[in-house]
């Protein structure tokens, strides 16, 4: 990881640059010891009074645990429906808007999606491929091919159901860790509050 440090006026800015080749399924947590270590180093250096999270997509959710352990209040800005919807968009397979979360509805929506691959299958296949192909372009192309193959064979509703349950518990943990949510729109605020 590359950590960039600079000041904007009197505000210290730290950026952790992390390259992402592919997501890890719908659960969206990316446990990564090096990322967490870099984050803890920054927290140790600045000892903040408050933390503002813009998004946790492709980040280790353990950073919230670190802040909670240190009693650092967390503010989270909502930008989309990521906490509620694994597809982020809340669009059903027929392109209608989802009317609200339910385990069964999410399972059916995700398992009917052409891009859904269970976390276990994706992790297993990517670990085999990543060892063979180090060039990013080849790696990404192989991921695309594997997604198509798995879609043809189907991953099944049972796999989607366990992924939905795990994701829901993970998102609930995130929500419980946050002290204050900020929403840029009344629509997003209402949708989040009703979830």
Placement of each model-derived feature along the sequence:
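A conserved catalytic-core segment of Leloir-type glycosyltransferases
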Residues: 1-47, 110-144
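Short N-terminal targeting/anchoring amphipathic segment
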Residues: 41-59, 73-76
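Membrane-proximal helix-turn-helix segments that form the acceptor-binding/catalytic region
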Residues: 69, 96-180
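Short aromatic-enriched loop/helix-cap "lid" or pocket-rim segments at secondary-structure transitions
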Residues: 1-2, 86-91, 96-97, 195
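Alpha-helix capping/helix-boundary segments
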Residues: 82, 187-189
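Short, well-ordered alpha-helical microsegments
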Residues: 59-62, 189
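Short, flexible loop segments at the rims of nucleotide/cofactor-binding pockets, characterized by
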Residues: 26-31, 51-53, 157-162
